[in-house]
């Protein structure tokens, strides 16, 4: 969760002022100019390639080369919380580039995307070899070429000092940083090879962070009186994997790393994969565990060079693919400090509290409510 004072957090359910601040810059964020905000909304979404997106209308801004344009202009948004007898507390609501600009009667309407879009658009003109070097140094080069001078944050738990072998980046700079496949179908991605994820946060900083899990600390409790609509529960098995097999293969004929295995070993879980689906796949039949279903996923990357690294990736993949079939949608009072990947505790019904991981939490700037989409682990009924 973004920094927020205890007083502001406690006042979210009360009558508070919700001012909005918008700023624009044409020099990469070295200087900022205030803009008159009309209306708009922000969509933080962990499942989107750009973690933050927004749509806003600005009133009578300057236009053209020295004003707001769709080529060089970057936009910063802030949601304020006005607690009585205290100064307004400003919470970052995203640092954006302009995807689309439309002239309106009162000013301009803007569709905005996070700074990932700059990196995504800066494709390599020719294939290039990156490394061998540490993950931090490889990421610094790829990010710095697209966003000169941009800081990179490495959250605790991400092993940025991991040595990576030389690898070829065909075109897609963002895939080389986050994850994907090259033109030959080989898995790439510095973050994926570390069992991590990468995104531009609400302040515009490119961030490498561990894949969030429900074991992370709870950042906010949402009692029933904070909800403005009845929670809606939903289940689907789309994207469910309860056994991951991870290997490292450079394709050069050298020894293959792994395989590393990770599976759901909790007998109380609906997605339980059995006591050992690798060494003893017949155990569920022998033990009468007729409800066990194994769903296997595989990941191979030339950037995985040690057994420990393969183990980390397998655990991260498992954490990200379990529980996606159990989700909760609800509308609550707006907490602009909430980030995708945060773990919250929700009072689903009277006295029944559940841990949920925030996937998305869109809200109207200046509004008092937000719509949350979450997921959680499933347990046997």
Regions found by a protein language model. Name each.
Residues 1-135:
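Beta-strand-rich assembly/attachment modules of structural machines
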Residues 1-29, 188, 212-364:
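Acidic, small/polar-enriched beta strand-loop surface segments
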Residues 23-25, 38, 43-45, 57-59, ...:
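A structural detector for beta-sheet-dominated domains
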Residues 54, 75, 96, 110, ...:
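A broad, low-specificity signal marking well-ordered, structured residues that form hydrophobic/aromatic
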Residues 83-112, 199, 344-374:
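Short beta-strand and beta-hairpin "edge-sheet" elements
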Residues 94, 194, 202-204, 240-242, ...:
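Residues that flank catalytic or metal-binding motifs in active/ligand-binding sites
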Residues 104-238:
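Charged- and aromatic-enriched interaction segments used to assemble
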Residues 378-381:
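Glycine- and charge-enriched low-complexity intrinsically disordered segments
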């Amino acid at each position: 969760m973004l920094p927020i004072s205890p007083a502001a957090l406690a006042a979210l359910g009360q009558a508070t002022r919700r001012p909005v601040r918008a700023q624009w810059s044409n020099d990469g964020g070295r200087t900022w100019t205030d803009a008159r905000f009309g209306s708009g909304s922000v969509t933080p979404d962990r499942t989107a390639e750009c973690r933050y997106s927004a749509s806003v209308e600005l009133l009578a801004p300057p236009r053209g080369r020295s004003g707001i344009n769709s080529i060089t202009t970057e936009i910063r948004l802030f949601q304020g919380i006005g607690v009585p007898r205290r100064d307004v507390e400003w919470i970052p609501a995203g640092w954006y580039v302009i995807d689309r600009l439309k002239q309106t009667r009162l000013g301009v309407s803007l569709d905005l995307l996070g700074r990932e879009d700059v990196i995504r658009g800066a494709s390599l003109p020719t294939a290039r070899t990156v490394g061998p070097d540490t993950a931090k140094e490889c990421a610094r080069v790829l990010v710095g070429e697209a966003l000169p001078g941009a800081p990179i944050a490495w959250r605790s738990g991400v092993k940025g000092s991991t040595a990576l072998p030389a690898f070829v980046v065909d075109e897609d700079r963002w895939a080389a940083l986050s994850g994907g496949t090259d033109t030959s179908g080989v898995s790439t991605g510095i973050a994926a090879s570390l069992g991590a994820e990468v995104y531009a946060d609400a302040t515009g900083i490119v961030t490498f962070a561990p894949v969030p899990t429900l074991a992370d600390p709870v950042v906010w409790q949402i009692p029933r009186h904070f909800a403005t609509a009845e929670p809606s529960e939903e289940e689907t098995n789309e994207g469910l994997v309860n056994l991951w097999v991870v290997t490292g293969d450079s394709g050069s004929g050298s020894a293959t790393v792994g395989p590393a295995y990770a599976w759901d070993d909790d007998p109380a879980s609906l997605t339980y994969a059995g006591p050992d689906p690798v060494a003893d796949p017949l155990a569920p039949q022998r033990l009468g565990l007729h409800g066990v279903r194994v769903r296997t996923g595989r990941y191979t990357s030339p950037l995985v060079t040690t057994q420990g690294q393969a183990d980390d990736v397998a655990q991260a993949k498992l954490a990200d693919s379990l529980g996606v079939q159990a989700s909760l949608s609800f509308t609550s009072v707006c907490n602009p400090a909430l980030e995708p990947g945060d773990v919250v505790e929700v009072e689903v019904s009277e006295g029944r509290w559940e841990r949920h991981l925030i996937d998305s939490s869109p809200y109207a700037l200046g509004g008092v409510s937000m719509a949350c989409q979450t997921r959680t682990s499933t347990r046997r009924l």
